[in-house]
């Protein structure tokens, strides 16, 4: 990425699985403001510190906030994990300025890993990983589970699609591993068969 991590590409695909929501959002907000194009996948597996019951109570309090005279004017309450992440990042960006709006427009977030991103290399952000930032034994909950509790209706669908994608990826991985094994055997056999010719060429200093 641009700011300090040493990676800079036209588009970075971030696997959000087991990343802390706030830390991930703050890092991505800075990257977006630096001009980096970011795609976030598997938003339903983002972690939030605190148990599910406490997080659900906090979100239900947020859902009660509305404009009395015209509730459709806001605040808008998103239920999907990708939109919750998008709104969190929006709060860390001056999105009402041209620079902030342009930065926010370069962010894309998805539940699961839709094509073509299932065939692209995905990266993680160590500074936002749960295993490095959350104390052992501390309670946490998944954003997808929270979204399901507050009205997101696609949790089961995304889970089923992810299981199918993982099974397909495993078959593809086993096939590639088998082909690599056959290729290495073919190289060893060719080296044995060509050993006399190679010795002759070496003696001629070719």
Curated annotation (Swiss-Prot):
Any single biological process term in GO: translation
Gene3D superfamilies reported for this sequence: 6.10.250.3250, Ribosomal protein L13
Q: Which family does it belong to?
A: Belongs to the universal ribosomal protein uL13 family.
Q: Give the record's GO CC terms.
A: cytosolic large ribosomal subunit
**Which source organism does the UniProt entry give?**
Picea mariana (Black spruce)
List, alphabetically, the HAMAP family matched: Ribosomal_uL13 (MF_01366)
Q: Mention one GO molecular function.
A: mRNA binding
Q: What does the UniProt keyword field contain? A: Ribonucleoprotein, Ribosomal protein
Please give the name of this protein.
Large ribosomal subunit protein uL13
Q: Name one Pfam family in it.
A: Ribosomal_L13
Cystine links in this protein are: none
């Amino acid at each position: 990425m641009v700011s300090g991590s040493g990676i800079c590409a036209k588009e970075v695909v971030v696997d959000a699985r087991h990343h802390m929501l706030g830390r991930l959002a703050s890092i991505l907000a800075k990257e977006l403001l630096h001009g980096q194009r970011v795609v976030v996948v598997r938003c339903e597996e983002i972690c939030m510190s605190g148990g599910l019951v406490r997080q659900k109570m906090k979100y239900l309090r947020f859902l009660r906030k509305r404009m009395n005279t015209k509730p459709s004017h806001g605040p808008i309450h998103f239920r999907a994990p990708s939109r919750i992440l998008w709104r969190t990042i929006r709060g860390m960006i001056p999105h009402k300025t041209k620079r902030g709006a342009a930065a926010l427009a370069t962010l894309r977030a998805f539940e699961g890993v839709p094509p073509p991103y299932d065939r692209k290399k995905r990266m993680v952000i160590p500074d936002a990983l749960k295993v490095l930032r959350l104390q052992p034994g501390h309670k946490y909950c998944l954003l997808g589970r929270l979204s399901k509790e507050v009205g997101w209706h696609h949790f089961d669908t995304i889970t089923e699609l992810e299981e199918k994608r993982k099974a397909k990826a495993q078959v593809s991985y086993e096939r590639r591993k088998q082909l690599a094994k056959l290729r290495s055997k073919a190289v060893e056999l060719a080296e044995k068969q060509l050993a006399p010719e190679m010795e002759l060429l070496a003696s001629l200093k070719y």
